């Protein structure tokens, strides 16, 4: 378990004190903090060889763990739907993991926010036939050069095929593979583009980077993130969670209500 502040300091106090200036050096909980070179470039290199594992959840939903953000996979007669697309250099291992689930094509992709470790696979997945849906600020940030001061890195505008073709402002509902998906925008949270995805029948909840299991999330002030918004997002997640809900965090192991409670009180 990673701790970035003494136990007697609450999450709210830690965030308000600027503790996430330390977390800003970490792209993923697996730890890039010790790297002295460009952290983004290091993550891209790590992703080329990082193992991708598949965890089956329920109701035809699985999660892929790799070098970047956690990817949810919903299968069914409409083809695969993904939530997030990992780091671009992880393509071979992500593709193999998806094929290992079944041979159905990826038809739809939802981005929980614009960061490279959640949208890196957008282009190749779109070229393979997936339509891309996101909150409107994700498209805005991907459409132009965007600087993240916390990572000391400027991201060039994404290729045209990586840009979400359909966007929404606040909340959105989808019906795919016999499942109702509720998409909620947090304004702002760790960016200004964060959404969560609730697979309602399965009661599986993908939080994106509004929740990192057993770690503090990075706040991207450069693209609208805020301390208070991050806290409010955590409170909204906690208010939504049920006793039997499966929670897929942006980073870290799949958890549940106890993990969200821990995140809100530690």
Predicted regions and their residues:
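Conserved beta-strand hairpin/beta-sheet module of binuclear metal-dependent hydrolase folds
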Residues: 53-99, 195-199, 204-207
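Non-globular, low-confidence helical/coil segments that flank catalytic cores
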Residues: 39, 43, 93, 100, ...
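Zn-dependent metallo-beta-lactamase
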Residues: 18-78
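Active-site metal-binding motif and surrounding structural segment of the metallo-beta-lactamase
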Residues: 54, 77-79, 89-133
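N-terminal secretory signal peptides
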Residues: 1-10, 20-25
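Divalent metal-coordination and catalytic microenvironments
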Residues: 60, 74, 84, 113, ...
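Metallo-beta-lactamase
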Residues: 56, 79-80, 87-89, 138-186, 191-192, 200-201, ...
């Amino acid at each position: 378990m990673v701790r970035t502040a003494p136990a007697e300091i609450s999450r709210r106090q830690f965030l308000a004190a600027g503790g996430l200036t330390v977390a800003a050096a970490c792209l993923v909980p697996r730890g890039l903090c010790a790297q002295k070179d460009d952290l983004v470039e290091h993550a891209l290199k790590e992703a080329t060889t990082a193992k991708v594992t598949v965890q089956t959840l329920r109701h035809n939903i699985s999660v892929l763990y790799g070098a970047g953000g956690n990817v949810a996979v919903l299968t069914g007669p409409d083809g695969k739907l993904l939530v997030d697309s990992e780091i671009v250099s992880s393509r071979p291992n992500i593709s193999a993991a998806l094929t290992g689930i079944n041979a159905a094509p990826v038809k739809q992709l939802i981005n929980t926010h614009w960061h490279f470790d959640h949208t890196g696979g957008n282009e190749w997945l779109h070229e393979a036939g997936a339509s891309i849906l996101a909150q409107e600020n994700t498209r805005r940030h991907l459409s132009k050069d965007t600087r993240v001061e916390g990572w000391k890195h400027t991201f060039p505008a994404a290729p045209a095929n990586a840009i979400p073709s359909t966007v929404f402002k606040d909340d959105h509902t989808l019906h795919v593979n016999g499942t109702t998906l509720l998409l909620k925008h947090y304004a702002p949270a760790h960016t200004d583009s964060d959404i969560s995805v609730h697979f309602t029948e399965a009661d599986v909840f993908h939080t994106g980077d509004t929740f990192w299991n057993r770690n503090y999330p990075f706040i991207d002030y450069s693209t609208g993130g805020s301390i208070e918004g991050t806290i409010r997002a955590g409170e909204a997640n906690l208010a939504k969670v049920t006793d039997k809900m499966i929670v897929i965090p942006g980073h870290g192991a799949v958890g549940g209500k106890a993990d969200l409670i821990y995140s809100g009180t530690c």
